[in-house]
């Protein structure tokens, strides 16, 4: 277990299993309050599995919308547009699994940009391109 806490903007991510610690098999992380909504986007390199720990969430995957509560899980395959939001803004916790590993690097780069004072549209664009994320 990594135990790494990454912060950038209003985002807080606890990395439970990094790509490095799993030999590249997966990344496992938790989004912590005050969670922000994630707009529609596509991953080209990994699948994404959302598991609700706290709060009520709406996960869009393709043309389907799932309203889920603690214990609920939704799978978003790579290449399919998806988004997530909380029913009560700012509340909730999500455990997110992304196989194969590597996606934790996206958050690590944004946290480094925050620490360096360079977090902004250019940092998001560079990290998104590097990690195969297209924002729609």
Q: How would you name each of these model-derived features?
A:
Residues 5-40, 46:
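A short glycine-rich, His/Asp/Glu-containing loop-to-beta-strand
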Residues 12, 37, 49, 56-58, ...:
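Structural motif
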Residues 30, 42, 61-63, 70, ...:
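Residue-level recognition of conserved beta-strand positions in structured domain cores
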Residues 78-104:
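Ligand-binding loop in jelly-roll beta-barrel domains
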Residues 108-136:
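Acidic/histidine-enriched, glycine/proline-rich intrinsically disordered or flexible terminal extensions
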């Amino acid at each position: 277990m990594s135990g790494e806490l990454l912060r950038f903007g209003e985002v807080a991510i606890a990395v439970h299993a990094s790509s490095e610690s799993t030999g590249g098999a997966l990344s496992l992380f938790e989004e912590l309050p005050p969670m922000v909504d994630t707009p529609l986007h596509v991953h080209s390199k990994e699948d994404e599995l959302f598991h609700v720990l706290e709060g009520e969430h709406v996960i869009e995957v393709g043309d389907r919308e799932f309203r889920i509560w603690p214990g609920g899980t939704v799978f978003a395959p790579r290449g399919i547009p998806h988004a997530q939001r909380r029913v009560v803004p700012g509340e909730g916790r999500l455990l997110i699994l992304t196989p194969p590993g590597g996606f934790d690097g996206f958050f690590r780069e944004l946290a480094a940009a925050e620490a360096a004072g360079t977090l902004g549209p250019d940092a998001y664009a560079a990290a998104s391109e590097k990690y195969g994320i297209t924002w729609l």
